[in-house]
Amino acid sequence: MAESQSPRWGWALTGSGHFFTECLDLIRGLSGVDLFVSRAAAEVVRMYRNKFELPQGARIFRDTTASAAPVGLFYERVYHTLVLAPATSNTVAKCVCGISDNLATNVFAQAGKCRVPSIVFACDTAPELETMAPGGVVKVHPRRIDLENTQRLSGFEATHVVLSLAELESAIADRRQLLGHG
């Protein structure tokens, strides 16, 4: 990376539709952001296509290669922070078990190996949640294993697990303040 370029935000999207549009709003408020879109996230993006406006200069990396080639950018110190949001219970479980078989889980693994701090917004975090589905609001009941995996992930090095949109907003604001920029 050229010395004149500032490190960027990395933001990984998973297949969760829960808080998806709110996360897009947060992404639009950042400068210097790259999106990592897993295959499952690409399906969700298609549903929200009309709301998928990004800030100027944002780059999008899609899950198109077996080796998830864009993860090499973490070794080049291109990123100061990774945000994994919204994170499905499947993504959280894979992160906890060290499985990096898609773009989102791979960038999380590489961020950890490169000591890039991560903020993870785990969506399945309460015994009962309400979420918006194509047919309207539905109640979701995360399994005990989902709640346990979220707890386990919160013990990972350089990983800040947030449990609500307000906590995600606060974690991003804190990180921005620490970095002194966007």
Where in the sequence are the language-model features?
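A cross-family phosphate/adenosyl-ligand binding-site feature
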Residues: 1-182
